[in-house]
């Protein structure tokens, strides 16, 4: 999907703009939130990212990210998580808060303005509001 996004979708959208954008952002929820962050290590096409309830529990993602350089120079990253997301029978997913805090620390350590918002509810609570907050945050930072 990243290839299609970079080589088809973005060029088509940007060709309709009156001028090139000054920056690009990427945002996603759950696995798409993981994808948004992963993209920062794969391409320099995105300057800002929002990951709402990102699946940062994904095996070895945070560990690999901590030892790899970014493909570009991210300017800002928004992270959010539901306060009850750790209350799950899935053992891997129980660590999502620890993994998200580790990602926040990694980004801050690398000098990237980053925020982590903890929201009421579980993974499925207020998904539209949380995505809107993440997009608003990257638009204003």
What are these regions (language model features)?
Residues 1-141:
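Non-catalytic cap/lid and distal C-terminal segments of serine-dependent acyl enzymes
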